[in-house]
């Protein structure tokens, strides 16, 4: 895999360009999720363009409505009593994004090109055990929830990736401030969806395409890892196969 990061001149978002390649002659199971640990704001809310989600419990996976699950508005994550994952079922035509915002409208927005289709909320919940886990994992950093973005709709399986195939996508991470807050999840979702469409539209997909050329150029080596990639390339050449990503040293 390859990861390229940059900031646009005068831009407010970090660009994260990802490339995963299956160099082999066989189908491979592919799994990718980008994980963002974000502050658990008092009265904070997760906003995502979905009307349903997948969750699990009791040995089964099931579909639930969004935002109200068993009488609880899960978009306000402090309402959630225990540890749980929600994998949001984002419609094909919807923009790919997720945001964590405080009551004053400030927070983190992540959005991406269409290939990174999945979005997830994970919380430790709000009980003594969940509080202890957060203390153990973060020390002085404070309470957090996880918002994630992935290639699949859920983390319950992998996606078949065809032989000799490359998948690329572009994600952006940055601060967002929402005005005219509403207690209605639907209104907040519609407002942020419109904002992301205006911000990204087709320009994000175009940026991904336009950046392909320089992403494939050799770069300056600033740190060398282990030699196992060289060993793998030597084995591939011996088998008469193409080496791994020759533009990467």
Positions of the model-derived regions?
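Short, well-ordered beta-strand segments enriched in hydrophobic/aromatic residues
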Residues: 3-5, 14-22, 171
């Amino acid at each position: 895999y390859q990861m390229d990061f940059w900031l646009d001149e005068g831009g407010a978002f970090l660009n994260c360009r990802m490339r995963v390649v299956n160099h082999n002659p066989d189908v491979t199971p592919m799994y990718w999720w980008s994980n963002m640990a974000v502050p658990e704001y008092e009265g904070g809310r997760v906003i995502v363009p979905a009307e349903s989600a997948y969750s699990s419990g009791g040995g089964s996976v099931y579909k639930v409505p969004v935002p109200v699950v068993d009488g609880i508005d899960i978009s306000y994550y402090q309402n959630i009593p225990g540890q749980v994952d929600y994998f949001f079922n984002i419609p094909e035509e919807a923009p790919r994004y997720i945001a964590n915002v405080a009551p004053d409208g400030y927070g983190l927005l992540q959005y991406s090109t269409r290939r990174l289709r999945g979005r997830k909320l994970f919380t430790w919940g709000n009980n003594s055990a969940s509080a202890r886990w957060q203390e153990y994992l973060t020390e002085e950093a404070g309470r957090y929830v996880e918002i994630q973005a992935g290639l699949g709709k859920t983390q319950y399986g992998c996606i078949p990736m065809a032989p000799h195939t490359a998948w690329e996508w572009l994600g952006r991470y940055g601060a967002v401030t929402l005005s005219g807050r509403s207690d209605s999840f639907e209104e907040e979702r519609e407002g942020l969806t419109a904002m992301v469409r205006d911000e990204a539209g087709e320009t994000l997909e175009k940026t991904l395409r336009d950046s392909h050329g320089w992403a494939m150029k050799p770069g300056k080596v600033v740190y060398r890892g282990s030699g196992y990639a060289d060993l793998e390339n030597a084995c591939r050449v011996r088998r008469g196969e193409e080496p791994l990503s020759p533009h990467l040293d």
